């Protein structure tokens, strides 16, 4: 005869893997063409001059230069540009 009642099962205990989103190159940093600047969900940051936007909204450098963050427009949107050297 068992001396302990059987333990119940739980439906918790799992979590999704982190997606490593965020800014990868900060303002003033030198980058090469093709370098990833930001990984994001949606357009928290918008592509400015010399910056491309991938299908998953990843921003990347189209030219060598320095990263520049700026807030522009009537809606105060955040843009990332590359100032060519």
Swiss-Prot record:
InterPro entries: Ribosomal_bL27, Ribosomal_bL27_CS. One of its GO terms (cellular component) is cytosolic large ribosomal subunit. Keywords: Ribonucleoprotein, Ribosomal protein. It comes from the Bacteria. GO terms for molecular function: structural constituent of ribosome. GO terms for biological process: translation. The keyword Ribonucleoprotein applies. Residues 1-20 are annotated as: Disordered. It holds the Pfam family Ribosomal_L27. Belongs to the bacterial ribosomal protein bL27 family. This is Large ribosomal subunit protein bL27. The lineage of its organism: Bacteria, Pseudomonadati, Pseudomonadota, Gammaproteobacteria, Enterobacterales. The gene is rpmA.
């Amino acid at each position: 005869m068992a001396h302990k009642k059987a333990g119940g099962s739980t439906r918790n205990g799992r979590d999704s893997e982190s997606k490593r989103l965020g800014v990868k190159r900060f303002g003033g940093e030198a980058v090469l063409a093709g370098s990833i600047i930001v990984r994001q969900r949606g357009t928290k940051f918008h592509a400015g001059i010399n910056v491309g936007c991938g299908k998953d909204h990843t921003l990347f450098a189209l030219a060598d230069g320095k990263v520049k963050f700026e807030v522009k427009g009537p809606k105060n949107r955040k843009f990332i540009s590359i100032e060519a050297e």
